[in-house]
From Swiss-Prot:
It comes from Pseudomonas syringae pv. tomato (strain ATCC BAA-871 / DC3000). This is tRNA 2-selenouridine synthase. Involved in the post-transcriptional modification of the uridine at the wobble position (U34) of tRNA(Lys), tRNA(Glu) and tRNA(Gln). Catalyzes the conversion of 2-thiouridine (S2U-RNA) to 2-selenouridine (Se2U-RNA). Acts in a two-step process involving geranylation of 2-thiouridine (S2U) to S-geranyl-2-thiouridine (geS2U) and subsequent selenation of the latter derivative to 2-selenouridine (Se2U) in the tRNA chain. GO terms for molecular function: transferase activity, transferring alkyl or aryl (other than methyl) groups; tRNA 2-selenouridine synthase activity. CDD domains: RHOD_YbbB. It catalyses: 5-methylaminomethyl-2-thiouridine(34) in tRNA + selenophosphate + (2E)-geranyl diphosphate + H2O + H(+) = 5-methylaminomethyl-2-selenouridine(34) in tRNA + (2E)-thiogeraniol + phosphate + diphosphate; 5-methylaminomethyl-2-thiouridine(34) in tRNA + (2E)-geranyl diphosphate = 5-methylaminomethyl-S-(2E)-geranyl-thiouridine(34) in tRNA + diphosphate; 5-methylaminomethyl-S-(2E)-geranyl-thiouridine(34) in tRNA + selenophosphate + H(+) = 5-methylaminomethyl-2-(Se-phospho)selenouridine(34) in tRNA + (2E)-thiogeraniol; 5-methylaminomethyl-2-(Se-phospho)selenouridine(34) in tRNA + H2O = 5-methylaminomethyl-2-selenouridine(34) in tRNA + phosphate. Monomer. Belongs to the SelU family. GO terms for biological process: tRNA wobble uridine modification.
Length: 366
């Protein structure tokens, strides 16, 4: 058996398999990518033991825990742990603080003939390590913000750069009012953990300058860490440009063709299209106050007609109507205003090819 470990850096850099012995309610609030939740106690059992601990102390709580997790219940859980351990011989187990729960799981595994290491300090210590990783990256590394009008393909540029930090990808959201995906967003803690691991791996590869897309503090329901967002407000900006026509086509592909395919892939043909249509309509409704009544109704009529035609024939051409209106009358004026306020920070502007080349060359200067 490997020794118990507190080398959190190595655990995350090497994507070491981990088994989380916390209760499901704890796991759902925040965990690490790829980790499997195989709890010692379920939520109800944990609550009972916690209440007992507060009222009668640790010894009584431990005794109650053994009474609740015994017999067939214990056998089934141990069997699941053994299966995980044998499938992941290089893995580790942990609980919240690396205390009694993970020690109990480790001991019961040993009784079943399996020696398996645990992570010292548990989830709490690993979470602290990742928060420190975020802080160190923000304070020690250079940042460049990639800005541009809606539909210029900022994410396309960002994801092709070795030093690109894709906040929207980590948040599973495109960042705009229309940005929700067919699958949900991670919990806030999961978002932060994934972001920190991303930074850790890139820095381990020698990257000390990061390019981030110009985002508001919220990417859907995920908050960009305050320290990172504040740093983004003062760093240099590179502005991506493209023609209105190209931007319309890119938005048509991303927010209509690809999003519809996403929903159908997840939910099936009939239900998927209905949910896709509802999502588009709701996204437009979410900004109806900012659009104003007349403009909202006009764009809504165009969107409804386009959706009806798409459902009838599969054709998506009519969607260009509301996309052109939304860009020209809403997003472009808003982004033009933002660009004006960032003008002093913009150090380069160009098309995708030019911006990609500039950012690649810039990253080699440090």
């Amino acid at each position: 058996m490997a020794d118990n470990s507190s080398d959190y850096r190595a655990l995350f850099l090497n994507d070491v398999p981990m088994m989380d012995a916390r209760a499901p309610v704890e796991f759902s609030k925040g965990a690490f990518p790829g980790v499997i939740n195989l709890p010692l106690m379920n939520d109800i059992e944990r609550q009972k033991v916690g209440t007992c601990y507060k009222q009668h102390g640790q010894d009584a709580a431990i005794q109650l825990g053994h009474q609740l997790v015994c017999g067939q219940v214990k056998d089934e859980r141990v069997e699941a742990w053994v299966e995980f351990a044998r499938a992941n011989p290089n893995g580790y187990l942990y609980c919240f603080r690396g205390g009694l729960r993970s020690q109990t799981v480790q001991r019961w595994l040993k009784d079943a003939g399996v020696d398996y290491p645990r992570i010292l300090g548990g989830y709490k210590a690993m979470r602290t390590f990742l928060l420190d990783t975020l802080h160190e990256a923000v304070t020690e590394c250079d940042l460049v913000v990639l800005g541009g009008m809606t539909g210029t393909g900022k994410t396309e540029v960002l994801t092709q750069l070795p030093n690109g930090l894709d906040l929207e990808g980590v948040a599973n959201h495109r960042g705009s009012s229309f940005g929700k995906r067919a699958t949900g967003q991670p919990a806030q803690i999961d978002f932060e953990n994934r972001l920190a691991i991303n930074l850790l791996k890139k820095r381990a590869a020698g990257i000390e300058q990061f390019v981030v897309e110009d985002e508001s503090r919220l990417v859907g329901s995920c908050n960009v860490p305050l320290e990172l967002h504040q740093a983004m407000q003062g760093c240099p900006v590179v502005w991506l440009e493209d023609s209105f026509e190209h931007r319309v086509e890119r938005i048509l592909a991303d927010y209509v063709v690809n999003l519809c395919a996403e929903f159908i892939s997840v939910k099936g043909e009939e239900l998927g299209f209905g949910l896709f249509a509802d999502r588009l309509l709701q996204s437009l409704n979410n900004i109806h106050k900012r659009l104003g009544g007349e403009r909202h109704q006009r764009l809504l009529a165009l969107m409804q007609t386009a959706l009806e035609e798409q459902q009838r024939s599969g054709a998506v051409e009519l969607h260009r109507g509301w996309i052109e209106g939304l860009l020209g009358e809403y997003y472009d004026p808003m982004y033009a205003y933002q660009r004006e306020h960032k003008a002093a920070r913009i150090e380069f502007a160009g098309n995708q090819f030019e911006v990609s080349g500039y950012l690649s060359e810039r990253s080699s200067r440090r």
